[in-house]
């Protein structure tokens, strides 16, 4: 490949620019989309015990979560979503978020946290550019440890977040 003198100058200028790490909004709210009230209560207790400073916002329906995400200026830290929900399920919600350029550019990690782990769901989920698929453990202690590991990972991760 032949590089012109102008291209070499442009490359040299780019290399001199400061490298910026763009981080996701780690202080933003944690969105949990879960229609099971018992699971909501368990997750509330776990997040309280883990003492995260992030606001926890629950939605029982995917439609309500989408309304919130498209109408707020707040950039959530992470989204935990169930798959099987009434009206707009987790897969459909993920598709709508991915199709919305403003939401897509916010680079909000979208994770499935569900009891449903059928092969079809896992394949469909990853085809929609999700950032993780976790089978919800049945034991409280295991749920808590899974949440701790997930949040810890995303707290240390750098994301190409949308810069305004």
Language-model-derived ranges and their functions:
Residues 44, 58-78:
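Acidic, metal-coordinating helix/loop segments flanking the phosphotransfer/catalytic sites
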Residues 85:
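Receiver (REC) domain active-site loop signature in two-component systems and cognate sites
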Residues 138-149:
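C-terminal output helix
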Residues 125-131:
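As written
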Residues 37-59:
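Two-component/phosphorelay signaling modules centered on CheY-like receiver
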Residues 34:
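Conserved acidic carboxylate
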């Amino acid at each position: 490949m032949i590089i012109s003198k102008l291209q070499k100058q442009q490359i040299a200028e780019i290399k001199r620019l400061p490298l910026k790490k763009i981080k996701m909004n780690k202080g933003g709210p944690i969105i949990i989309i879960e229609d099971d009230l018992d699971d909501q209560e368990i997750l509330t207790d776990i997040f309280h015990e883990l003492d995260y400073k992030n606001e926890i916002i629950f939605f029982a329906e995917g439609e309500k979560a989408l309304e919130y995400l498209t109408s707020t200026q707040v950039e959530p830290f992470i989204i935990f979503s169930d798959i099987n929900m009434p009206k707009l399920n987790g897969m459909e919600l993920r598709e709508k978020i991915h199709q919305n350029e403003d939401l897509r550019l916010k680079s909000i990690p979208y994770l499935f946290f569900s009891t449903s782990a059928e092969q079809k769901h896992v394949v469909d989920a990853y085809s929609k550019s999700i950032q993780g698929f976790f089978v919800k453990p049945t034991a409280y202690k295991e749920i808590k440890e899974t949440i701790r590991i997930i949040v810890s990972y995303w707290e240390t991760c750098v994301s190409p977040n949308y810069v305004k």
